[in-house]
UniProtKB/Swiss-Prot annotation:
UniProt organism field: Xenopus laevis
Binding site for ATP: 195-203, 218
Keyword terms: ATP-binding, Kinase, Lipoprotein, Membrane, Methylation, Nucleotide-binding, Phosphoprotein, Prenylation, Sensory transduction, Serine/threonine-protein kinase, Transferase, Vision
Subcellular location: Membrane
Organism ancestry: Eukaryota, Metazoa, Chordata, Craniata, Vertebrata
Biased composition (Low complexity): 542-551
RGS domain segment(s): 57-174
GO cellular component: cytoplasm; membrane
Post-translational modification: Autophosphorylated in vitro at Ser-487. Phosphorylation at Ser-36 is regulated by light and activated by cAMP.
Name the record gives this protein: Rhodopsin kinase grk7-a
Record region (Disordered): 529-551
Propeptide stretch(es), residue numbers: 549-551
Reactions performed catalytically: L-threonyl-[rhodopsin] + ATP = O-phospho-L-threonyl-[rhodopsin] + ADP + H(+); L-seryl-[rhodopsin] + ATP = O-phospho-L-seryl-[rhodopsin] + ADP + H(+)
Modified residues (Cysteine methyl ester): 548
Matches recorded under SMART domains: RGS, S_TK_X, S_TKc
Length: 551
């Protein structure tokens, strides 16, 4: 007898993998669709957009990818501005270099820009700083280069930024902002197989029709949300994801609604979660060099959340996902909460086996709980089980709670290095004030000897190769037949209050993520080509691509 469930899964996986590869037929379909696209006219974009934009240098010229790109293009038209921009790029290259190569780069930079500036003087330095640099010894030069960097950034924020606002490059930025704010609905995407499910709905793979970019779409059932009073939690997750822009945390790209669902479109992580890699590939556990690499990236992600006054509360390997290249990101911020002065957090939240003693004993808690869960996760990646569960027998929830509160961690697995034992002990300290990351205001876990092989500047710049790369021909997700369907929610009706909530949630494209997608997929260069002409017709029709026709 034909296994229809297996056939359905095969078809869904084939379509999904084909979309990820961008076959020749898909490329032709994409090119055809892009020909119909064009930017809004300059007059329209100026009128509708200019008044809504806050003229903030950091936001426009640094954080927003298209703003940054157009600002750099503008700087290239004025020799003095171009010189400053090139100098800052050279400083950035020097900061990210290692060993003797870094020393050589510094000597080259000093000679080229300070000692014998054949390409022109850096006038923004001022007489005092220029004099100090000219008289400085080599040992003092790194500090002076950083002062020169600060002076260069301050210079670009002044006259160059003002001139940029009166240039055609800024007009083009406004056109892109108008394009960015186009309405987003389900016709903007192709939908593929289900990847999993959560408390309020399912997660599926989707593809943007105009760019070919793949994402994961978290679909929250409107009726289920209302029935379970989950609206506030869903909106909080969305608002937190909007604020977060880190290579170590999943990014939110779009928020839109359908008739039945609220949809969060986020980074698609094809490599599976760390729980899968701990328990389903070879012997339980992960080799130590991978543990160090993932832990370093996780630390960066947690520190980014804390810098935004956000408490994660659900750190565990299951919520750490790998991308195509083997880099990891934190996911599922459904339990995350904003930390507010004078408002203690006491609600029990998290996953059994990862919750800190202060959560389990119902006292006030804050950022240290994330570091406790980090210690549990490092231990689990190495040992193949969490620190307060007996791997040889079933441990009750109450026993895990007792051990977490009372027992010291024991290291029986032979793979634990001394550095690994030490960082786990420090993260798993019972008292939050004794916990690594929380002992002082500047207690940075990245400085621990466990991470001695990691250059964090290069890691954050994406310049460190992951020790493991997922197989691109594998779908790291359950078979679609193993993902249970949701039952229909009955007896729920929507009113004006619900409609207002849906509108507040469905805000469309998220600027930084959307702009990155536009640049990475080549659409920015295509639509900026002065010789290009759009053929008209709009770009979001409901036609299915060849990839999707077998679904």
């Amino acid at each position: 007898m034909c296994d229809m469930g297996g056939l359905d899964n095969l078809i869904a996986n084939t379509a999904y993998l084909q979309a990820r590869k961008n076959s020749e037929g898909d490329v032709k379909e994409l090119q055809k669709r892009r020909k119909s696209l064009s930017l809004p006219s300059t007059d329209v974009s100026r009128k509708e957009i200019k008044e809504t934009i806050t003229l903030d240098y950091q936001s426009i010229c640094v954080e927003q990818p298209i703003g940054q790109r157009l600002f750099r293009d503008f700087l290239g038209t004025v020799s003095e501005y171009k010189l400053a921009e090139e100098f800052l790029e050279e400083v950035k290259e020097w900061e990210l270099e290692e060993g003797s190569a870094k020393e050589q780069l510094m000597e080259k930079l000093v000679s080229r820009r300070f000692k014998e500036p054949a390409e022109g003087s850096l006038n923004f330095l001022g007489k005092d700083l220029s004099s100090r640099i000219q008289q400085a010894q080599s040992k003092d030069m790194p500090e002076l280069i950083l002062l020169a960097k600060d002076a260069g950034n301050a210079f670009l924020m002044d006259a160059p930024f003002q001139d940029f606002q009166n240039s055609p490059f800024y007009d083009r930025f406004l056109q892109w902002k108008a394009f960015e704010r186009q309405p987003i609905n389900q016709k903007y995407f192709y939908e593929f197989r289900i990847l999993g499910k959560g408390g309020f709905g399912e997660v599926c793979a989707i593809q943007v029709k105009n760019t070919g970019q793949m994402y994961a779409c978290k679909k929250l059932d409107k009726k289920r949300l209302k029935k379970k009073n989950g609206e506030k939690m869903a909106l909080l997750e969305k608002e937190i994801l909007e604020k977060v822009h880190s290579p170590f945390i999943v990014s939110l790209a779009y928020a839109y609604e359908t008739k039945t669902h609220l949809c969060l479109v986020m980074s698609l992580m094809n490599g599976g979660d760390l729980k899968f890699h701990i328990y389903n590939i070879g012997e339980k556990g992960i080799e130590i060099k991978r543990v160090i690499f993932y832990s370093a990236q996780i630390c960066c992600g947690i520190l980014h959340l804390h810098s935004l006054k956000i408490l994660y509360r659900d750190m565990k390997p299951e919520n750490v996902l790998l991308d195509d290249n083997g880099n990891c990101r934190l996911s599922d911020l459904g339990l995350a909460v904003k930390v507010k002065e004078g408002k203690p957090i006491t609600q029990r939240a998290g996953t059994n086996g990862y919750m800190a003693p202060e959560i389990l004993t119902d006292v006030d808690y804050s950022y240290p709980v994330d570091w406790f869960a980090m210690g549990c996760s490092i231990y689990e990646m190495i040992a193949g089980h969490t620190p307060f569960r007996d791997p040889k027998e079933k441990t009750s929830k109450e026993e895990v709670k007792r051990k977490t509160i009372e027992d010291e961690v024991v290291f029986q697995h032979p793979v634990f290095t001394e550095e690994a034992k030490d960082i786990c002990r420090l993260f798993l300290a019972k008292k939050p004030q004794n916990r690594l990351g929380s002992r002082t205001n500047d207690d940075d876990p990245r400085k621990h000897a466990f991470f001695k092989s990691i250059n964090f500047q290069r890691l954050e710049a994406g310049m460190v190769d992951p020790p493991f790369v997922p197989d691109p021909s594998v779908v790291y997700a359950k078979d679609i037949s193993d993902i249970a369907d949701f039952s229909e929610v009955k007896g729920i009706e929507f009113d004006d209050k619900d409609s207002k909530f849906f509108k507040r949630f469905a805000t469309g494209a998220i600027p930084i993520s959307w702009q990155k997608e536009i640049i990475d997929t080549g659409l920015f260069d295509e639509l900026n080509d002065p010789s290009r002409e759009a053929t008209g017709g709009g770009g979001n029709s409901g036609e299915k691509s060849g990839v999707c026709s077998i679904l």
